[in-house]
Swiss-Prot record:
Its EC number is 2.5.1.7. Cell wall formation. Adds enolpyruvyl to UDP-N-acetylglucosamine. UDP-N-acetyl-alpha-D-glucosamine binds at R94, D309, V331. Keywords: Cell cycle, Cell division, Cell shape, Cell wall biogenesis/degradation, Cytoplasm, Peptidoglycan synthesis, Transferase. GO terms for biological process: cell division; cell wall organization; peptidoglycan biosynthetic process; regulation of cell shape; UDP-N-acetylgalactosamine biosynthetic process. It catalyses: phosphoenolpyruvate + UDP-N-acetyl-alpha-D-glucosamine = UDP-N-acetyl-3-O-(1-carboxyvinyl)-alpha-D-glucosamine + phosphate. This is UDP-N-acetylglucosamine 1-carboxyvinyltransferase. One of its GO terms (molecular function) is UDP-N-acetylglucosamine 1-carboxyvinyltransferase activity. Pathway: Cell wall biogenesis; peptidoglycan biosynthesis. Belongs to the EPSP synthase family. MurA subfamily. It is an enzyme of class 2 (transferase). It comes from Chlamydia trachomatis serovar D (strain ATCC VR-885 / DSM 19411 / UW-3/Cx). The active site is at D119. GO terms for cellular component: cytoplasm.
């Protein structure tokens, strides 16, 4: 299992350039499969999830040229060569499920996707995806091995109301609707900035697609596509991650390309606990300004709320903030397990099955903890940790950087490779001492 040694009591200073958004890039690669036209993507992050998606597209028939130094991918899929996704792709992440929507127009007699893997943050049901596809005319068969979708008579536009504004379901239904005849209206849709980026990409490709302020997306089926050149938006999760690392280490980091309009809920909560930042034309500077004050309710939500991927690193900030703070996780039902690692380091965290806010969420009757109380500030001690999922991984690295008592061993670091480009190099250039397992003797 890949691991690193992270030395504590470190102050991070300098600048870092945020990469293109993981959650936009992977979806745009899938969207390029809608047609046989050429697509050029710029600002592409060199991360494992993108590498896996590129490999998946190649297996399906895409011709891909990736200039990693220039951060540019050119992809062209003259025809689809495979209608069954190899299992090695589904066990890594959840991207393959989007092929059900993206490829039904080009493969009407069936697409098969094996059972999915990804982060250990809950089952994340596919019910919304599959029911929406059925309303468009798809035939769905579910087995122990995976999911089979077909549309031998073609897809037809429909009115779909999602029970919950699921990001993945919204993306899948947008892609399927592009290949349907007529008009599709999706109500209660997710409208995260990555979905808006997908919509802009599709508009460039010739798709008539619009949104409005009440979470409604209107799509007209498209038969004639254009070639597209598109620059991927900066990754708001990576930007916030380095911003939190600056504040918790009592340092100062300029995050180049960070866009404040994508991060307003995060910046609002960061300011409420005393975290410092200043917005510039080409990025955001984050810094430690004064002792952090807790006593906040951090409630995750879909856009335009505080996104769930910011929650885990923010818990490290709350562990160093004076007072009692509450986390209420409303998006994923199993996303607080990582707190055990922070408790091992000395953080004071209590888990609850109840909704610890005035608003009950969809997990209020569930039998799992989805609320937490964090008491701070508490000094953290270096220890051994195993990363359970991507964003918890960065939280553990943040905690290790400020820990007392030497260095922390952190294992399963390949999780970080999924979502952070050159994360180790970026941290080292900011002043961190981060060593791979085979080179630890340098600092011993």
């Amino acid at each position: 299992m890949p691991g690193i040694k992270v030395f504590g009591e470190t102050v991070l200073r300098g600048s870092v350039r945020v990469s293109g958004a993981k959650n936009a890039t992977t979806k745009l690669l899938v969207a390029s499969l809608l047609s046989d036209q050429r697509t050029i993507l710029k600002n592409v992050p060199n991360i494992e999830d993108v590498r896996q998606t590129v490999d998946l597209c190649r297996v399906l028939g895409a011709i891909v040229e990736w200039d990693q130094q220039a951060q540019v991918i050119e992809i062209h899929t003259p025809r689809i060569l495979l209608s069954k996704v190899p299992p090695q792709f589904s066990c890594v992440n959840r991207i393959p499920i989007l092929l059900l929507g993206a490829l039904l127009r080009r493969c009407p007699y069936g697409i098969f996707v094996p059972i999915l893997g990804g982060d250990a943050i809950g089952p994340r049901t596919l019910h919304f995806h599959l029911e929406g596809l059925k309303k468009l005319g798809a035939e769905i068969v579910i087995s122990d091995e995976g999911y089979w979708a077909s549309a031998p008579n073609g897809l037809v536009g429909a009115h779909i109301t999602l029970p919950y504004p699921s990001v993945g379901a919204t993306e899948n239904l947008i892609l399927a609707s592009v290949g349907a005849q007529g008009r599709t209206i999706i109500k209660n849709a997710a409208l995260e900035v990555e979905i808006i980026d997908l919509i802009v990409f599709l508009q460039k490709a010739g798709v008539e697609i619009t949104t409005d302020n009440d979470k409604t997306i209107e799509i007209f089926g498209c038969q004639d596509f254009y070639s597209v050149e598109h620059s991927i938006i900066p990754d708001k999760i990576e930007a916030a991650s380095f911003g939190m690392a600056a504040v918790v280490s009592q340092g100062r980091i300029f995050v180049e390309q960070a866009r404040h309009e994508h991060m307003i809920p995060f910046l609002k909560v960061l300011r409420s606990i005393g975290g410092g930042f200043s917005v510039h034309e080409n990025g955001i500077e984050f810094f430690y300004d004064k002792p952090l004050k807790g006593g906040v309710l951090l409630e995750t939500d879909v856009h335009p709320g505080f996104i769930t991927d910011w929650q885990q690193p923010f818990a490290v900030l709350l562990s160093q903030s004076e007072g009692c703070s509450v986390i209420h996780e409303t998006v994923h039902e199993n996303r607080l397990g990582y707190l055990k690692g922070l408790v091992k380091m000395g953080a004071h965290c209590d888990l609850f099955h109840e909704c610890l806010s005035a608003k009950s969420c969809r997990y209020s009757t569930g039998n799992h903890p989805h609320s937490a109380v964090i008491h701070g500030p508490t000094p953290l001690q270096a220890t051994d940790l195993v990363i359970p999922d991507l964003r918890a991984g960065f939280a553990y690295v943040m905690a290790a950087l400020i820990a007392e008592g030497g260095a922390s061993w952190i294992e399963n670091t390949e999780m970080l490779d999924r979502g952070y480009t050159d994360w180790r190099g970026k941290l080292e250039r900011l002043g961190a001492k981060v060593l791979a397992r085979d080179s630890v003797s340098v600092y011993v």
